[in-house]
């Protein structure tokens, strides 16, 4: 049955940034598809809630408090999956971020942090996960959560967009190096109804602008992204690697314009 190709029974998945929003949705979705899920994030109470939700649905999960910018935490997250459950099949690099900031007031420190959070940490997580996937499960799948900010002209997102664009290219390059045993793909996420979009969704004027600029007429949901992540994590995508899957409501231009001061001659 073709639906069986989307099942993850007997597999073990690690999801970073799993305490809230998209990461939480992905963790729950993978568990519903049969995976044992190891969830990592910085806030223990958030992780406990995710684990409780998974267990209430009949799934199995383990919480590991993790800051993906800390080497010891990254290693503990991967090691916990292998030590507790004997294998590793899936890694979802969801942790990432940094807010909007106009280019002319973006500091070197801010830019460096955007790169570390959005591409360096996912690279190091992937590096740690690949060999255990091969050794314990014969291979696996890495799913990187990227953003449409990576391939659109979007004011105030120079640091974040650069980090996600680098993540996209890293995905392609790792896919070539890790094939055929470990697949590596990414999801280019549009505007999703999470805490980060709350300022837009709670303002009638901004929400109307967002929906008018989105062909599907609504923001995404964490479940929308979880469905895509399940496809890329599961045997259903066994002939797919090195690809960026856009899940964005059909947007080909920014759903929101962030006003920034234009450059002027110095007086």
Where on the chain are the PLM-derived regions?
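Short C-terminal tail/terminal secondary-structure segment
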Residues: 1-4, 152, 241-267
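Conserved glycine-rich cofactor-binding loop
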Residues: 12, 19-21
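Short, small/polar-rich loop/turn modules that mediate ligand/substrate recognition or access, typified
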Residues: 92, 179-183, 240-242
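Substrate-binding pocket helix/loop in short-chain dehydrogenase/reductase
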Residues: 102-103, 107-115, 206, 210
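Active-site helix of classical SDR
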Residues: 126, 163, 171
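Alpha-helical segment proximal to the catalytic Tyr-Lys
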Residues: 131, 175-180, 238
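Residue(s) in the substrate-gating loop at a strand-loop-helix junction
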Residues: 147
């Amino acid at each position: 049955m073709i639906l069986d190709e989307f099942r993850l029974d007997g597999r073990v998945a690690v999801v970073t940034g799993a305490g809230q929003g998209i990461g939480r949705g992905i963790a729950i979705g993978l568990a519903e598809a049969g995976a044992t899920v190891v969830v990592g994030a910085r806030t223990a109470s958030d992780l406990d809630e995710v684990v409780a939700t998974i267990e209430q649905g009949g799934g199995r999960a383990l919480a590991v408090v993790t800051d993906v910018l800390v080497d010891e935490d990254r290693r503990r997250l991967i090691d916990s999956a292998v030590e507790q459950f004997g294998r590793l099949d899936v890694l979802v690099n969801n942790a990432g971020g940094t807010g909007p900031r106009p280019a002319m007031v973006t500091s070197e420190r801010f830019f460096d942090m955007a790169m570390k959070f959005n591409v360096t940490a996912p690279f190091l997580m992937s590096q740690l996960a690949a060999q255990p996937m091969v050794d314990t499960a014969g291979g696996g799948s890495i799913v990187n959560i990227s953003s449409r900010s990576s391939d659109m002209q979007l004011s105030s997102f120079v640091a974040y967009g650069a980090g996600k664009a680098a993540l996209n290219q890293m995905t392609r390059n790792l896919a070539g190096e890790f094939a055929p045993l470990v697949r590596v793909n990414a999801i280019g996420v549009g505007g999703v109804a999470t805490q980060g979009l709350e300022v837009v969704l709670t303002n009638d004027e901004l929400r109307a602008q967002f929906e008018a600029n989105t062909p599907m007429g609504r923001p995404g949901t964490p479940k929308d992204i979880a469905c895509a992540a399940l496809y890329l994590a599961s045997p259903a995508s066994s002939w797919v690697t090195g690809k960026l899957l856009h899940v964005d409501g059909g947007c080909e231009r920014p759903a929101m314009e962030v006003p920034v001061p234009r450059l002027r001659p110095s007086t």
